[in-house]
Amino acid sequence: MKNIFNWLDSLKGRKELPIKSLPSQGIFYANDFKLWIKKVKVEDILEYEKLYTSDISVVLVLIKKIVQLYTTLPSKYTFDDIKSTDIIFIFLEIVRFTTNRAVKIDYYNDISGISESIELVPDNFNYFDVPKALKNTFNPETKEFIVDGYKFSVPSIG
């Protein structure tokens, strides 16, 4: 049955992004939370390129706009439910899905002394490992850590 849904999604120009592949690893989302990404329209790419700047606050606004326009969530969720730690990763997945090409970042390798590039994919991403002492404080129903009566979670966009 899942293959039929994947086929229908591909006809709609969208694909499901596994929540476990996100930087948050999905632990702060409700169990029924799902996320689909769509390919970006040419006019939005042109607008992004026209407005792109080295000002990080402008870049973040543009990234959030693209993510908001090109993600689909179940009806009981909104863009504001997406965790802020996942936004840039989702944006890069949208870029990869739209261009059908790898997203690579160039960097200088201090050990080898040469410039290299790395592909940004879940396999190359270092996920946060929750310390064992903190894992014991996690409430799976509320999706929060509870320490000394205080509740902690990663911030959402909203």
Placement of each model-derived feature along the sequence:
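Short, surface-exposed, charged amphipathic helix/loop patches that serve as local interaction elements
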Residues: 1-158
